[in-house]
Amino acid sequence: MRRPPPLGPTTASGPEGNVRNLQKRQAPGPGAAGGCGPEAGGCRENKQKRRMVARATPGRGEVESDKSVAASGAGKAARRQVEGRRGPVSPSDSSDPRGLEAAKEAELPLQTERHTKEKRKVTEASSDDPQPGLDLVRKESLTSSESFQTVECLQSLGKESIIEGIKRRIRNKKLKSLENPPLKITENEATQNIKVEFQDELYKNTPKYSCNILSPEVENNSVLKLRDCNCFPHSKGCNDENNLPYKPDGGCMHVAENFSKKENLRSLAEKSDTNSIPQLLQTEENVMGVNKLLPEESDLYQSKTNGLLSCLQHEKNKYSIEESSVGRKPRKRMKLSEKADETVTEMNFSNEYNKSELMLQENQMIADGKEAETKSPLNVLRKVSHNTVSLMDHLLSVPETVEKETSSEHHVNAVFQKTIEPLLKEETENASEPLGYESMASKEDFKSMKSFIGKSPNEYHIERRSSREDLRSASEELKLSCQRTIPMTGKRTWPYYSCARISAWCWKKASLPESSYFLRGSQESCRQVDVPKHQTNQTHLTDSKLLLQSSLTETNTESSSKEKLDSNSNCLSSVSAVEPTLMVIKEPIIKDDKKIKSEELSRRGSEVISNTTEDTQLTSETQSLTGNKKKARGNLTKLNLTATSKDGQEANNSAGKTIHRKACIAQQTFIVPDLVKILNTGRLTNFKIPLLKNKSEKRKEVNAKSSEREAYSPLELLDNLSGADVRQNRSKENVSMMMLGPQTLSIRNSVTPVQASSDSFYNKKSYSISPSFTKQGNNSKPSNHVSEPGNIVSNKEVASLTVENNAFSCDPGYVEKSPSFCCNEQETFRPVSSEVRGRKITKNFSEVGFPDILKAYEDDVLLIDVIQDDPDLFGVSNEGELSFTSEVPKISQEPNVAGEHQSTDSKYMETPVKKEPSDDLRELPVLDCGWIKPDICASNSAESEIKRDPKDVNTSLGEVANETSENETLGDFSEQIKGSDLDEKHRFTDKVITKEEKENIYEVCKSKDSRNADFMVGECQFAVPVPKPLCLLVPPLNLSGRQEDTILNTWMNDFRFLGKHSVLKLQNPETCEIFKREKNVGVFQKSLGLMIPYKYCKFHFNTLRGCERPLCKFAHVPEQGDEKVCMDVFKKYININELCLLQRAVNIFMEYYRKFPPGVYFDLQVLNDLLNSLLKHCLLKEVFQIVNLSIMVKMLPSLKILLNIFEYVATMKLRNAVPALIDIFCKLVEAGMVLDPEHFNYIVKLLYQVQASKQEITAVLEMKSRLQMRRFKKNWKCDLDSALNKLEHCKEKGDWTKLGKLYINVKMGCEKFADFQTFCACIAETLTKNYEDERPDIPFCEFAETVSKDPQNSKVDKGVLGRIGISAMYFYHKLLQWSKGRKVLEKLYELKIHFTSLKGLIGPEKLASRCQIVNVAAEIFLKSGSLDGAIWVMRESEWIINTPLWPCDRLDVLNRHNLLCTIAHEILAKSLYRQTFEVLQNLPGFQNSQETVEVSQYSLLFNKLLGSCIESSSLGMSSSVAEFMISKSIPIDFSFLRRLITSLGRSRLWLKARAHYKSALSLGCYPPLEGNLYRKLLLIPSYLSEIEMLLAIEIFMVSNASSIQSPGTSTQILQIVLKRCEDNQSRSNDDYQAAVERLIMAARISDPKLFVKHMTVNVNKEQVYSLEHCSALKWLKENMKWAGKVWLFSNH
């Protein structure tokens, strides 16, 4: 986290060098990112500082205690070092405020002396303290918060070599002041000198933090009071026990450190007057930043105090610019680094002094501005310091007690605001001369003046002792100063747990210096440090100033928010006094800012905007410091946006500025991680915050309540500047908050200021959120959290600001490495920012104390409520926009960040109004510049956009603003842009997104580009120094060449690590799927107003973007029967006329009509309109698809559509489309489309224009000739009335052939099938009605013959003829004209028309069942004597009677039964047994169970058939009939069955005989076989035939097979008894004797033969026979296999 000592004066030996070294030594700690950046030789410098302090300060223990009070974390390290040098000093966190209270209780003279001493001590201690931020804060709260802030600022700036140079100067001055502990006058002079020097350095290093910088003494007392008032207010809102538990590291970057600072400030506040509490409330926002930059806060506070005093002095001594030169002298000693510091101080001061005006001047006179501005700001600071004494005396009446001083400081703040306004104006005018840096320096000087004014006279004297160093430190602290201050009470008192707590009060400038390492403050510091480096490298302070200004501007833009955060942290110790002053300063600045804003927008862009906007917003509301701070903050944000963009352009010209931007970007990235975490923590966007609706009013109210509401100030400023600016300011505030969290993580000290700044930005938007959010802002994580939901757009801007600031924060080391610290800074910056941008904060973040941020977030849980997706507060796409802001700022880096802030602000303003897919910009915002660029150019990848440059980011910001409120944002933002050079590029942004529909497309691109952009930004955004991104189709915001260069460098120096994504993964389109796919789909997509059934996907049908679910459970294609839904969807899509919707309509049309035919809801006009819309969008391929499908479904488009297609192809010279078009044309003509000759001629002409081939033209001509041949005259072809008249004419003449031709013509010419059906019905009626019986001809037959001869005859024609034939058949059946009816049926048979499945066209036959139609036809044949015809009709109908598919009435069934029976009798009479059996088999009741008919009634028919078959010896037919009867349980005559069995046996058909015998046996035809079978006894009736007797003997043998085949059974006898018939005893003798012969015959016909022996006659005179054993055994051996199966097993 540390940097090597800066080259040149930065590392110069001496008190300042020692101080720097001391600060460097203090920097190392848990929060290495803390107040001081890494510097080579940090230990040596620390030792030197120690020696310096030992030499300079007699009482270091006291100073040490003060320092410990000022910053717990940094103070611990500092105390350890000081204790090593001075002796053990007990750490004092909450106890430190006691010392402050004691100091307050002391009389003013004593306080003055004590302040002088403490200031000396603090100066020495600060040089000694390795962690000036923490120790100084503690000591400052106890002894001299000013010196602490100075040291703290130096610590935060310690990463910059310039800061240490400043510290050394401050030490020298403080040593001098210690040596000269005179009264207020001496102190004031020394303070002024120290302030001048310190501010010069601080302004150089931390232009935005300079406001917080106060001389140690001045800050000591007044800081206690002011902290109580300004810092404590923030601490009230933000300070909790968590505030004190800051990390011992000097890098107040950790939230804990911030908390500790806040707590220290609170303790100071508690010790100080209760009046300080309101000030504390006002400074709560600053306190957030102070919490983050608490160590820096003291320095920043000193800078503020110095700046305030300088402002007051300048106000009183406006004409005494000479003192400013005094401040410059130390700068000169500082060499380039000091010069850079001075430049930074000047920049800060000028920023404070002239925000907008300085911006304009910055572009013109950077070098001159540096010197002149430095002089003027320093002079002003000194004057203000002197004036501050008087003003302080005036306002405070030089209260004896510190509390009195505190209250007076409050008054001073108020008065100073009033006084500073003119001063700021004057200074602004003066600063306008120096252009860039002067404006910033003047602004920072004003901040310092504010802080000086806020300080007590004692502090003022102390400040005079170290006026120059103090001024520098004051400038830095002023920059680092937070609007929210944490008292040194040891508790975090955030009276208002609102996001707004951190709002505008966070001094962007003030917070930036200290947090410049890792936060916006870090960015500032980096800028300042970079500026000295650049100065060293470039030799020109002007160049460094330009770089610083651009960087600062960018940093001020993001830094402003960061500074607010930083200033909040600084306010912990110093803002108490500084903030009231800052408030005063900011009000005049607001006025000036609004004026200057336009100038600065054009000139300084981000630089002045950040400072001016901050001050302006803060100053906007003079009634309440918080409100003023908020306003100033909002204004600063706006101005910073503009200035930042412009500065970004200028920065492009200078590497240093680029580095600063990068640092800012890195810081922004840091902020973004917290915000991302917050965003990730719980879709904060879901929480709605009504604050934004009445943005200006609520903002004012919130500002009055807390600094966070300062965001509303931008709304007020919106009227003056532009809605876009205001939105940008808000976005900046949100961004600042976002940046705050991550920055705090990244850098403890610098991050803390940055957090304060971010809190400031956050507070600006926190108005939308809540005080708790502001509180969270100090915690860094809470503010990020708040920024995410509520301030998405703003957060994006904030992110950009953060990025810029982070660039500085990370860049310090890099800047030290090289003036064009693009690569080094990028490396240094990248560690901090790599995670920051994605959601991962780099090691710096972890070091920064991310857990503290988490803790702060936990403390500020209310942020969740604030982050709700309130369109008024955050815009519809707050999430995406937040991501965008964080990402984009990173990309755009400082200048772009400013532009982005503006865009984001305006976008934010508008975003609340817009809740459409365009809100998906949220996703793109995630992508950084890449995201923005997608807005600008959807086709361009985010990666390319990222490569483009911060310009692209600016453009994207502009786009964002445009998207958010295209009109409002574009107008306002354009105005700002016009005021600055940004206008043109922002216009491009405006152009990029002009419509919500385009936003939709933009979202699509955004999702794609955003991924690329995010990836690029995360991995390569700043890693690769690329020129302006080529992807930027539209020119980016007009940035000065320097800014543009810087932007490019910033991209090159991206704080992120290559290959890593920024913390804001929510911004990644895929990550945003959480919000977009699931959430945005329902929340962000606007309904098209269609009434879609529940089963269909509402997103697919009813939204512009459609369904984005990978697997959707709802249908995307209408189902059969929902054709009306299709038509409604098509109509809606056609009305909207969006490309994506039309393509979706094509898909739906194709998928639906491929499956289902057109129905009653099909509207041909909708088809034509859809084709027209597709043609207008040049979707020729889709047109062809739909036309081809419409031809398939027989729904042809209109002729006009066809001609339009030809015209389009000819106009566009689409030669390749001609073959497909000709093919479609031929299909349409063949399908029935009618074209006139002139149409063909026109088509041929168009084909010649498109240079169609001769073959293609010939094809068209051939279709023309074919069409002419097929059609009749045009007057009647398609005219139904004419055709009907023709039909009547044919009827009258009986010219049925002509009627057939008329039918053919109508069929070819009629376009509507309904008309054709009507015409056919008329034909059927004509052929059936009013027909004379005398005429022998059959009209239907002649008509059908003519139609059938048509070569175009098709199935349709056959169907029509069949239906007309049925009508004719019914007609003749009704008239009992069987012969004519038979002729009709024969004609149908001849034409192979299956009429049985058709229905008639008219009359009852139109509703007749199929059974009825068949019955009528069969009856006609039967009546006409054609049995074959009747059977043909039955067979044609498949004998169907009643089926589910063809239901019929019972009457139809009865008619069928009678008809079939009649046919059977007639056929049987003709001995057609097979046909008869077929007819009988199809009687009702045999086909299905639905025919509830008793089949037993058919017994007579079947027995008659069976008998006839047996008599005719049709054994096969007889057997089939018998089997059917047995199977259907139809009663069978046993005599026929026995006869059948005998006949079959005698015919040697044994198989069938045995089967029927067995069936007959089961039916009871034969007496049952008793158990005698097993007793070797067989009883055979005498009436059986020989066949039946043989079958009985076979059963007997098979049944006794086991005993017959056993070896020992040969002696057994098988007896056969021939039973007599009792009924015929009279004839029994003859019949019985015949039976005996049949028995013997049966034995003989057996195979093998059986032998039967007569044994005896029984009592009944029945012959008894025995079956020879050997023959039976032989028969079984040969036949047992089949016999066993036949006789032993049942067939069923």
Curated annotation (Swiss-Prot):
Subcellular location: Cytoplasm, Cytosol
Domain of life: Eukaryota
Disulfide bonds: none
KW Chaperone (keyword) present: no
Predominant location: cytoplasm
Location of region: Disordered: 1-135, 600-629, 894-919
Its biological purpose: Important for normal spermatogenesis and male fertility. Specifically required for progression to the post-meiotic stages of spermatocyte development. Seems to be necessary for normal expression levels of a number of testis-expressed gene transcripts, although its role in this process is unclear.
Name recorded for this polypeptide: Protein TOPAZ1
Taxonomic source organism: Homo sapiens (Human)
